[in-house]
Regions:
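Extended C-terminal regions of large enzymes
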Residues: 1-269
Length: 269
């Protein structure tokens, strides 16, 4: 973050009237894949900066920006794509695949993203379908880090027990946004808890899952949600609808949303 601010940050715009103003813009000028890239884009988000950066043994933030931009232009998820490249790198190191890619090879990473998007070649075609299929096709279960075929993001479940439970129980796989317990485990919001202590983390995760089901329904971003809780949600909902629901009723709605999602997953297998 410090390097980005000192070297490539050019603007700090924001969504209309937002008090958080989290958006940043960067400009990079770097050669990757035999091409010169002059790009202005939203800044390196934490998750894909991890998957294309340290998780792939790369320390070049400008190259990471190019790779994220390439994913955006192809319409593929940058977190998942970076993790799939890292999985391919590990399988290459273990000689589980031929024509793979080496750790930190920026040109190969850039080209593999194109191959994944266009499903070119056996490895890229399999990577495009996620970790579960790759592990089965190439006998690489030991390189697989996913839940419901969604790879884990940048919050290590070994050190954050609440997040570990979140990955295991999220309706969409290893997602950090369905129940963001790092708010309490790292940031101390609404109060600090020991991230390594498993005690009470099931209840904590359920609380965050229910609250996020509500905030997602309200279309409130997670950064604003840090400053709000059920009291504010009740005021907003009642003010928008003219109804008079209680905190308990709104929390129950969050539980019903999460349960309905799980019911649908079970229904379709």
């Amino acid at each position: 973050g410090e390097w980005v601010r000192e070297n490539i940050l050019v603007d700090e715009p924001t969504c209309h009237s937002c008090p958080v103003a989290c958006k940043k813009e960067v400009e990079v000028d770097v050669e990757v894949g035999g091409e010169e890239h002059q790009i202005r884009m939203e800044s390196l988000e934490y998750e894909p900066a991890f998957t294309f950066g340290s998780n792939s043994m790369s320390d070049d933030a400008e190259v990471t920006a190019v790779l994220i931009d390439r994913c955006n232009k192809y319409g593929i998820d940058a977190i998942e794509s970076g993790n799939m490249l890292a999985m391919a790198m590990e399988m290459t190191e273990k000689r589980q695949v031929e024509d793979g890619i080496d750790w930190g090879d920026h040109d190969a990473m850039y080209e593999m993203l194109r191959k994944i998007a266009e499903r070119e070649g056996e490895l890229a075609d399999t990577l495009a379908d996620g970790a579960a299929g790759v592990a089965k096709r190439f006998d690489a279960e030991d390189s697989r880090l996913d839940v419901k075929n969604q790879t884990i993001p940048a919050y290590d479940p070994r050190s954050m027990k609440g997040m570990a439970i979140g990955y295991a129980t999220s309706n969409r796989g290893a997602c950090h946004l369905r129940g963001y317990t790092p708010a309490a485990e790292i940031l101390g919001i609404p109060e600090a808890v020991d991230p390594a202590d498993p005690e009470g983390k099931g209840e904590l995760q359920v609380t965050f899952q229910d609250l996020h089901a509500i905030s997602d329904s309200f279309d409130i971003c997670k950064f604003n949600a840090f400053a709000e809780g059920i009291e504010e949600y009740v005021l907003q909902y009642n003010g928008m609808t003219g109804r008079d629901v209680s905190e308990e009723e709104l929390i129950e709605a969050g539980k019903r949303i999460y349960t309905l999602e799980r019911y649908y997953n079970n229904l379709v297998g």
